A protein has these predicted regions:
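Short, surface-exposed "cap/lid" segments of acyl-processing enzymes
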Residues: 2-45
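Short, surface-exposed alpha-helical segments at coil->helix boundaries
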Residues: 21-25, 57, 175-179
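The alpha/beta-hydrolase serine catalytic core
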Residues: 98-220
Length: 220
């Protein structure tokens, strides 16, 4: 397979995932066959303290600083779950993103599906415990993470071409908003529905085909 130029692929993990997720390890191994491609799986939560305090705006700005620090160009993004929200807003705010492959993306801030009573309790106590899968334990999150998230309640237009792969049985991030988003921005967004729940790890081979054909424009 041939690639016409050097490229950068950034993987943005989900809210309670990490840069060492199943997807990150899978793509890192697959992309070893493409020396023209720089692969970066950014870890937004290197420690529980980072997870406790980091906001959506903070993650977007952290991604910007990472891109500048590493002088990255020809960027495409794989955004998984919450990473999809970060990808869309980063591209909209800063530009420089050629394509986005979004995997069961959160297109808006979802407040984890908490009830009004649960949100009120979170505000009252100032922090609430959330299970972080990568750390394997509950970690408190400050309420101002929720306050910041309220800035991201409406979907934004895509700044570059997007393919969304989403499971029809996803209960964590339901597929219906992705259907609406793809219909609203049909010129830029293509939705691929699969029989899967949220993590999509049973469909990594399919996702990899779109990494090659869509993000890399690989010629066979």
């Amino acid at each position: 397979m041939l690639i016409n130029s050097t490229k950068t692929i950034i993987l943005l993990h989900g809210f309670t995932s990490s840069g060492q997720s199943t997807k990150a390890r899978y793509f890192r191994e697959k992309l070893k066959a493409f020396p023209q491609v720089q692969f970066h799986a950014i870890d937004f939560n290197p420690t529980p303290a980072d997870f406790e305090y980091v906001t959506t705006t903070g993650r977007i700005n952290r991604l910007r600083q990472y891109v500048l620090d590493h002088d990255l160009g020809n960027i495409s993004i794989i955004g998984s779950s919450y990473g999809g929200l970060i990808a869309l807003h980063y591209a909209h705010r800063f530009g420089g993103v050629e394509k986005m492959l979004l995997l069961a993306p959160g297109l808006t801030w979802l407040s984890w599906g908490l009830s009004e009573k649960e949100l009120e309790q979170w505000e009252k106590t100032g922090a609430a415990p959330f299970l972080h899968r990568a750390f394997g334990k509950e970690v408190p999150i400050k309420y101002y993470v929720q306050v910041d998230g309220l800035r991201y309640l409406e979907p934004i237009p895509p700044a570059s071409p997007v393919i969304i792969i989403h499971g029809r049985s996803d209960k964590t991030v339901p597929i219906e908003p992705a259907r609406v988003y793809a219909a609203d921005f049909a010129d830029s967004v293509r939705l691929i529905e699969v029989d899967a729940d949220h993590d999509l790890n049973d469909h990594l081979e399919l996702i990899w085909e779109y990494v090659k054909s869509f993000l890399l424009d690989a010629k066979f």
